[in-house]
Amino acid sequence: MNEKMSFSQLLALSLMLFALFFGAGNMIFPPAMGQLAGTNVGAALAGFIFTDVGLPLLAIAAVVFANRSLDTMAGRAGEKFGRFFIILIYLLIGPLFAIPRTGSVSFEMVVTPFLGADTNPLIFSVIFTAIFFTAVYFLSANPSRIVAIVGKVLTPVLLIAIFIIGLTAVINPIGPLGEPVGDYNTIAFFKGMVEGYAAMDALAAGIFALIVIQNVEAMGIRQEKNIIKYTMLAGLFAAMGLAVVYGILAFVGATAGPLGEFTNGGQLLSAVSKHMFGTAGMLILGVAVLFACLTTAIGLTTACGEYFSDHFAKLEYNHIIIAVVLFSFVVSNVGLTQLLSITVPGLLMVYPVLMALVISGFFDKWFKGRQPIYAGILIGSALISIPNGLEALCATYGIDVTAMSNILQMVPLYNLSLGWVVPAIIGGILGYIVSIVKK
């Protein structure tokens, strides 16, 4: 049987996956990173792309080769761990971090630029996010073609706006590349790698992979090798698109020095848009971002509602999305900068474990499904990632944890944000020994 997908079908599939990945965080983190990286923006961008393009692509592959099952991939270290980790991922890309961020970014891009310096933004934020999340609830409770239409129309508009800003920045840059700040002076690649965590695409990649696989099968592709082939091609093309957009946004941030310093990427992009195209340009970009964020929020809310209602019989879909929307509304009003400062420590705890899980999955042929090996790898990575996240959280709130920091600095590669690697390898070796003894 000669199964073949047309180019237009593959392009549509790739654009769909790109749109799934391209949310609020993808807009604000690259320019903010570029602003701090300055002349080292290339190295920082490479690190960012490694964790926010490369790792999601690996995660898609890991799910595809794990019998196209998220449960299989996550459950290799144990069924209970697998269930716990999947729930944690849904909470992180749902009401804890990603959904609230869509409201915060929308407010930052659409409303904040028009507020006076003496205006209290909280009142306006509460009103705006109340309207935003009410819309999210009704569109999630009543799935409609409006969401698909908005996604198909607004994503291209947003991309066109980004490319126009990027082209203008290249032809007529606002200023020269700035000077690197802090760790961007010495370890720009590894600093960019950690910044890539914040977009959270790798967390969602496994879920998105299942959506792509469903669409591939809906296009009449049935053979296993062809499902793998077209899913991976869609992932590759989407990844290439993300890398190009990140490069544009990072360059814009790196050359925006004359406009001043900004506390987050949303403020920076608004200022750049206003500088290049005036208030109208800033408003057009803001509205495009608003609808992109709205579409993302609806998709994530729906995903959370479907997962928890399917896996927990006593939970009703409508009750879940109400809880998700209300919690997201409250969290979104802490402010974008504050929300980001809380997000990073949490991701520092989770991402190394996810990376260990994804990478180790490619060695299943040699591990032969031995659960103790996977458990050892994940425990080893968590022994460093959790203290690392706690250290970052304490630093955010000015809590002195010098003793813990001194101990962590003794771990190989810790200063490069790769302190989890050696403990994960040691844990895997110990797990292998345990599996041999048990056998």
Predicted segments, located by residue:
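Select transmembrane alpha-helical segments in multipass membrane proteins
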Residues: 6-17, 42, 80-93, 126-130, ...
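Hydrophobic, membrane-embedded alpha-helices of multi-pass small-molecule transporters
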Residues: 12-22, 166-175, 184-249, 281-293, ...
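Hydrophobic transmembrane alpha-helices that form the core helical bundles
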Residues: 32, 82-116, 293-310
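Membrane-water interface regions at transmembrane-helix termini and the short interhelical loops
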Residues: 65-73, 131-154, 218-221, 330-342, ...
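Hydrophobic alpha-helical segments and their helix-loop junctions in multi-pass secondary transporters
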Residues: 95, 99, 159-184, 202-203, ...
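Membrane-interface loop-to-helix entry segments
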Residues: 139-169, 344-355, 374-383
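A generic transmembrane alpha-helix motif of multi-pass inner-membrane proteins
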Residues: 172, 181, 370-439
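Extracellular/periplasmic helix-exit of transmembrane alpha-helices
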Residues: 240-268
